[in-house]
């Protein structure tokens, strides 16, 4: 059925297409990311050449590199691939928890890898800022709360965050909430503390690091969802949740392809408490209205 949520999705698609050809906006966003990442030598953001740019043309500096799935990447040492993977996941966390500004199109065409003489000089080139989207705490706050609740395996906290996002249909059966909580708790295993909540043994090495390249997590999530018929009780998901899920899946896929071996919890944990009190207050406000 054509619902308000569905119409909001159509409006969002139209807005995304408009932003993709708004070169003034993309140039502004590119400059912004170049500025906030200027002190982080792991990342390269092209420079906008104003002299040759206009409303219809955006001219940038040429930045060399190889594609993420180039065979040369897997020839790098494990340490170097871990360095790259950690950098991309940390960037994802900064977008979600710190900046409220997210690259909503995390396909590999938006990245290049610049291989240095050693891991200290490997860099990630960030391209195409046309799909950057700003979020306010009204919409991203409950999404962050879903991440925190999943990380702590806190089903009640997760339920409140879902309610704040209007995620489920009215009066969902308790079994559905239990099944969806279990799905979220499994989905976050890549960022989970393996000592608290161990994932399947085949995705950990002897040091307790997550084997992203061997992970079959998406398949397990799909199987769990279809097994429990979760989709029967869902409204059209809020677009903000889909953007967040797509962002996290994009980061997961990046680390999966380059076969990183990284404990995700050591990346996520420094960000978990950012905006936490405000996010919890926002969830309470939205669920009590």
Regions found by a protein language model. Give the residues of each.
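Hydrophobic "anchor" residues on beta-strands that sit immediately upstream
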Residues: 57, 103, 124
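Conserved protein-kinase catalytic-loop position immediately C-terminal to the HRD catalytic Asp
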Residues: 55, 109-110
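Conserved ATP-binding subdomain of kinase catalytic cores across diverse folds
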Residues: 1-69, 87, 98-99
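Catalytic-loop of the protein kinase fold
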Residues: 98-108
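Residue-level signature of catalytic and energy-coupling elements of molecular machines
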Residues: 26, 59, 107, 128, ...
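Juxtamembrane "helix exit" motif at the C-terminal ends of alpha-helical transmembrane segments
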Residues: 35, 102-103, 256-260
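Helix-rich C-lobe and terminal helical cap/extension of kinase-like folds
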Residues: 11-13, 54, 63-67, 71-87, ...
């Amino acid at each position: 059925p054509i619902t308000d949520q569905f119409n909001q999705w159509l409006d969002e698609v139209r807005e995304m297409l408009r932003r993709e050809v708004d070169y003034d906006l993309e140039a502004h966003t590119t400059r912004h990311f170049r500025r906030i990442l200027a002190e982080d030598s792991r990342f390269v953001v092209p420079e906008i050449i104003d002299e040759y740019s206009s409303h219809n043309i955006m001219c940038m500096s040429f930045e060399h590199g190889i594609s993420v799935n180039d065979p040369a990447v897997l020839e790098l040492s494990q340490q170097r691939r871990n360095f790259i993977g950690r950098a991309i996941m940390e960037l994802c966390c900064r977008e979600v928890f710190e900046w409220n500004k997210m690259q909503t199109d995390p396909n590999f065409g938006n990245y290049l890898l610049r291989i240095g003489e050693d891991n200290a000089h490997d860099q990630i080139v960030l391209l195409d800022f046309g799909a950057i989207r700003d979020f306010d705490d009204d919409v991203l706050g409950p999404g962050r709360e879903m991440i925190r609740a999943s990380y702590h395996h806190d089903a009640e906290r997760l339920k409140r965050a879902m309610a704040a996002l209007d995620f489920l249909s009215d009066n969902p059966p308790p079994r559905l909430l239990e099944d969806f909580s279990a799905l979220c708790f499994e989905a976050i295993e890549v960022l989970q503390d393996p000592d608290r909540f161990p994932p399947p043994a085949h995705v950990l090495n002897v040091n307790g690091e997550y084997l992203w390249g061997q992970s079959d997590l998406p398949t397990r999530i799909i199987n769990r969802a279809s097994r429990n018929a979760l989709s029967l009780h869902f409204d059209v998901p809020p677009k903000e949740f889909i953007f967040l899920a797509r962002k996290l899946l994009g980061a997961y896929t990046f680390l999966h392809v380059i076969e990183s071996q990284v404990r995700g919890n050591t990346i996520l944990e420094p960000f978990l408490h950012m905006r936490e009190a405000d996010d919890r207050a926002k969830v309470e406000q939205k669920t009590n209205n």
